[in-house]
Amino acid sequence: MEVNILAFIATVLFILVPTAFLLIIYVKTVSQND
């Protein structure tokens, strides 16, 4: 079973980018509430 490296990277980025974006918003919100 071949592993398509580009497809793997694209999938990882597709998951990590929105996750990082939500984490940044969460941290900013928590910091403002302090």
UniProtKB/Swiss-Prot annotation:
Listed GO CC annotations: chloroplast thylakoid membrane; photosystem II
List the InterPro entries.
PSII_PsbM, PSII_PsbM_sf
User: Which GO biological process entries does UniProt record here?
Assistant: photosynthesis, light reaction
Q: Where in the cell is it found?
A: Plastid, Chloroplast thylakoid membrane
| Its membrane topology | Single-pass membrane protein
Provide an example Pfam family for this protein.
PsbM
Supply the HAMAP family for this chain.
PSII_PsbM
Q: What does this protein do?
A: One of the components of the core complex of photosystem II (PSII). PSII is a light-driven water:plastoquinone oxidoreductase that uses light energy to abstract electrons from H(2)O, generating O(2) and a proton gradient subsequently used for ATP formation. It consists of a core antenna complex that captures photons, and an electron transfer chain that converts photonic excitation into a charge separation. This subunit is found at the monomer-monomer interface.
Name by which UniProt lists this protein: Photosystem II reaction center protein M
Q: Which organism is it from?
A: Piper cenocladum
